[in-house]
Amino acid sequence: MPRYCIILLFSLFTAFEPQAFDDDTPMRGITISTHGGGRDWASDEMVSTLRDIEILGANWVATHPYAGISQDGSVRVRRFEGASELAPAHWTRPIVEAHKRGLKICIKPHLAYWRSGFEWRGEIAFRSEEEWTRFWADYRAWILAVAEACKDADAFVIGTELDKTLNHEAEWRALIADVRKIYKGRITYAANWSDYTRVPFWDALDAVGIQGYFPIAKNQNPTETDLRRGWERLVKELRTYAQKIDRNIVFTELGYNQSYKAASEPWTYRVDDDGARPLQEMCWRVALETIENEPRITGALLWKWFPNPRPFGRDFQLATSRIMPIIAEAWQGEVPVITFDEEAYQRWREQRRRGRGRRSNQN
């Protein structure tokens, strides 16, 4: 084998010292989603949104810039009128505003799969070599553009739930190497909860990123003891894996819906009646307490918040008078005075119920 090939392979596969995500404190983060394409991340309302999140005890936030995906492998980026093509404000302003408040920020690009023919990101795959080639060229260009624009961010996620691309190890390793040339912060990948052990390139990243929708209980009416036992089993599994590959765990998403399946199928989007609220609240309490007490789990980015004046969506709500105190108590041991416009939420919810726009559960 030629000498330059040996050097190249060595540089791609040699382990390095990972950057810690947590420093001296756990990652206590909240993902700020969008009511439409991400434009609201550049609004003045993001400033008050960050303030509200900080009050809960958060020290991290995240946004998830979008690009579209097609069956032919092409990746498309939506351009807002008047926005800079190189560094659109909805990518960059959240970084500036978060840092002003002393918050760290993670940029977590998402492929918008709706209307593409793919049911979810884990299904994204292509039939021909031509389509795969197009995908990797387009995806690489997009990820590098976001990384360049967001190089002041504290963490960057190179991909989210792209299960059927994981056997393309060489393409992923090349992309990681290219991102590191322009971005000096922490880097991870957001693996689906059921596939994190299939990711072959954790050694090239700074942490094991997992979309944390693990089933914690088998039945739909678990007790708190059931949840604690479920988390105990999960933490043991995660701790063993983290030690094996010498990387800590970061939950790149963690969410519990108002659902009777919140513990058994946490990924379920269906919102159930108010009778499901106690289970949702119990899931949050046990999860947050467990994460705080496990050294191998760096922390989590909770799913999901929205920019003011509507910090709530139809599902996976965090900005409610029920859930916010649970988060605050877990993160800072006290519950601050938090104002919440319940009437505004109910008006908006009724508008959504009448069929305005696409479902908010797509992320």
Language model: regions and residue ranges:
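Aromatic-lined carbohydrate-recognition surfaces of secreted/lumenal glycan-active proteins
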Residues: C106-S116, A155-N167, R173-T197, D246-L254, ...
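Glycoside hydrolase catalytic-domain groove-lining segments
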Residues: L86-P88, R93, R101, K108, ...
